[in-house]
């Protein structure tokens, strides 16, 4: 089976639960301590029960130092492509390349 030219990575994909935001952050920290490679969250800006994805990724990145952060679902119809690209690029710069 092909390896597609890159290492297999493992990550955590917590639900960005607005009712329990500290739990999401605890899970992200635990993912890093456990040696996982990535923490990724969903982008559903129209759902009141979910935290804003970019804000959440910023806080996760601030509380960790090695895991990469990413969206696992980007809601393109509700995100201007230029603004989305700038958000991703800014977070990548601020995290030292962890996006």
Language-model features: locations:
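N-terminal beta1-alpha1-beta2 module of alpha/beta enzyme domains
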Residues: 1-64, 68-72
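Conserved strand-turn element in the central/C-terminal portion of the radical SAM core barrel
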Residues: 72-78
């Amino acid at each position: 089976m092909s390896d597609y030219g890159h290492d297999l990575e493992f990550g955590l994909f917590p639900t960005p639960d607005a009712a329990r935001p500290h739990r999401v952050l605890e899970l992200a920290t635990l993912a890093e301590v456990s040696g996982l490679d990535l923490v990724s969250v969903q982008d559903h800006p129209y759902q009141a029960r979910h935290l804003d994805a970019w804000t959440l990724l910023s806080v996760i990145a601030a509380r960790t130092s090695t895991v990469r952060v990413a969206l696992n679902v980007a809601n393109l119809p509700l995100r201007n492509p230029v603004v989305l690209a700038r958000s991703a690029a800014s977070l990548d710069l601020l995290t030292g390349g962890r996006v």
